[in-house]
């Protein structure tokens, strides 16, 4: 019995050549408090955060299925921590209109650190576990996006 890969690489599934883009940018740009002025680096960080959270959760689950699961305990913990931080950061950032920019900046910086920690751990297992390699790469992408977005935010003083 042939097993179909339900998680094909993006663009490689002939039935779904490309995933539709997230609708975050159009949604935020229509917000009455934003009026079309969108921080593109923040949008990239939001999308990267949601994507990284999913990849980290999948990696943690894949690690749990490995025979040597005890050797992957720290990797699993960091995957789950990273996923939670990414979700919290993205969730806060999508509500950025009228919110605390200083807090968003700190969350983005924290998310970048969580992603860096997770990537370092995943890279230790990357040669033996493909899911750890993929996760580490996704964490690095999210880390970069969060650092770029954090640098773009200049909180106003009240």
Question: Which role does the model predict for each range below?
Answer:
Residues 21-158:
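Amphipathic alpha-helical hairpins
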Residues 1-21:
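Short, Lys/Arg-enriched N-terminal segments with co-localized hydrophobic residues
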């Amino acid at each position: 019995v042939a097993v179909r890969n339900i998680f094909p690489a993006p663009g490689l599934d002939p039935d779904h050549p490309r995933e539709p883009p997230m609708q975050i940018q159009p949604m935020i740009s229509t917000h009455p408090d934003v009026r079309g002025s969108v921080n593109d680096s923040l949008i990239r960080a939001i999308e990267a955060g949601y994507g990284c959270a999913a990849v980290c959760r999948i990696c943690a689950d894949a690690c749990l299925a490995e025979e040597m699961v005890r050797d992957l305990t720290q990797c699993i913990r960091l995957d789950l921590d990273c996923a939670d931080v990414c979700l919290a950061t993205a969730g806060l950032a999508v509500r950025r209109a009228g919110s605390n920019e200083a807090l968003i900046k700190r969350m983005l910086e924290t998310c970048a650190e969580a992603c860096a920690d997770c990537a370092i751990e995943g890279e230790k297992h990357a040669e033996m576990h493909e899911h750890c390699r993929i996760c580490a790469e996704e964490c690095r992408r999210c880390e970069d996006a969060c650092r770029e977005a954090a640098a773009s935010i200049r909180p106003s003083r009240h």
